[in-house]
Amino acid sequence: MEFGPRALGNRSIIGNPMLEDTRQRINSTVKRRPSYQPFCPSILEEERERLFKDSFSHKHMAIAFRMKKQHIKNLPCAVHVDGTARPQFVEEQDNPNYYRYLKELKNIMGYGVSLNTSFNLHGRTIVRTPQDAVVDFIDCNLDELFIEGYRVRRSS
């Protein structure tokens, strides 16, 4: 389990950083905060030099790096208004399941990047137990919940 102020892929709300409405949807329906407030991306370590100028490996979303201009338009929800992002660079040994998820995104979208924010609703603490996760999932507008090897989907 992570500790500290950042969700690092285990207790996270994740989303497609290529879709412009991802940030708006999470900010308005889950986090209930201003639409301009940014999220941090989780990125495959091997994508770091392709996507960022003057970056170094960093795993905790605490340092902002300037994204290369040619990628900003393709990843609008992964970058702040000033062209920077506070990424979590993920290596396989750090979190094998999350790494595989990012590798699959790269195969599908061409980018090993996911929007990542802590799994907590406005005014609540980050989920700590499976029960917390289910309660918050029921109380918000997320599509799916992946928990301990299970996939839970909302009924249509």
Segments predicted by a language model, with ranges:
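Flexible beta->alpha loop and helix N-cap segments adjacent to enzyme active/binding sites
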Residues: M1-S156
